[in-house]
Amino acid sequence: NIIIRFRVYNEGFGLRYEFPQQKSLNYFIIKEEHTQFAMTGDHTAWWLPGDYDTQEQETQETKLSEIRARFKKAVNWDNSSVSVFSETGVQTALQMKTADGLYINIHEAACEDYATMHLNLDDKNFVFESWLTPDATGLKGCMQTPCHTPWRTVKVSDDARDMLSTSLTLNLNEPCKIE
């Protein structure tokens, strides 16, 4: 059994996959995750090249359809370690703006004991798919039920400043345990 849990807020939503305790599933390995985010058009995007080893890249501004053409030039190949996975792969948080002026942000929250998420773009259909960072052996995660994935978050607003002021990501993380 798997539960797909959604939490919806005024400024967006989060979703995650939950695996309850069950007789037929105790330990399992995550090979891939195929969460998809379908865009409505060729939006302007502010993005970093998808790289397993570093986030020390410069932010790029292009249309979604232009990511592939810009990708090789966008990567800082002088970093001591570079591990890109696709010519249309980007890091989260990914910020976009539609032709109508709507801002969209895709990210994650409560990422604990699970691989971090990048996004791989199908640049013909403008669909992003989650792309998890593997460990040294190529696995994306070793899980034991009951367990869950991080939240996959989508924030929307007609004002880019709202992306910084929203509490959506904070609300999806566990409360601080430090007293």
Describe the residue ranges of each PLM region:
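N-terminal accessory beta-strand-rich subdomains and adjacent acidic, glycine-rich linkers
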Residues: N1-I178
